[in-house]
Each structure stands twice: as structure tokens, then as C-alpha cells.
Swiss-Prot record:
Entry's family note: Belongs to the UPF0270 family.
Spans through the membrane: none
Pfam short name (any one): UPF0270
Protein name: UPF0270 protein YheU
Stored InterPro entries: UPF0270, YehU-like_sf
Cross-referenced SUPFAM superfamilies: YehU-like
């Protein structure tokens, strides 16, 4: 189930994004990026529709994924 990011409180959204970023590993590419930079990148992707929040009732989880991979 897709969850509009706008429906979440700012604190909840920030916590979800931070949790997602911290789970994604440590591939920094050429330059290491701060947690704040990574959170800002994900937030921008949610705001422009490149990424979506997805809730799995089966697994009782919320995840962030590229919109192109999301199937209802």
C-alpha cells in the first residue's frame, strides 16, 4: 500500500528517511556524504515523485522505494 509522504508528521517522515538511509549500507562513491545530505536527497526524491513510501501489512513495515519499482 502506498502512503503519501505528506500525510506523515515532519518528525515521523524524518525518522523513516533516516532509518532507510542507515539501512542502505556504506557505498559512498567518490565522496563520502553526511547523513543529513543523504536524508535531504531521499526527501527530494519523495517530494518530486521519484520515490514512494510503501507499507507492507503482511510484514508490518514501511519502506522507501523507487516509484518505478512500486506495483499496487
Amino acid at each position: 500500500m502506498w502512503i503519501p509522504w505528506q500525510d506523515l508528521s515532519p518528525v515521523t517522515l524524518e525518522n523513516l528517511i533516516e532509518s532507510f538511509v542507515l539501512r542502505e549500507g556504506t557505498d559512498y562513491g567518490e565522496h563520502e556524504r553526511t547523513l543529513e545530505q543523504k536524508v535531504a536527497d531521499v526527501k527530494r526524491q519523495l517530494q518530486c515523485g521519484e520515490a514512494v513510501l510503501v507499507c507492507s501489512e503482511l510484514h508490518e513495515t514501511v519502506n522507501i522505494m523507487p516509484r518505478s519499482q512500486f506495483r499496487e
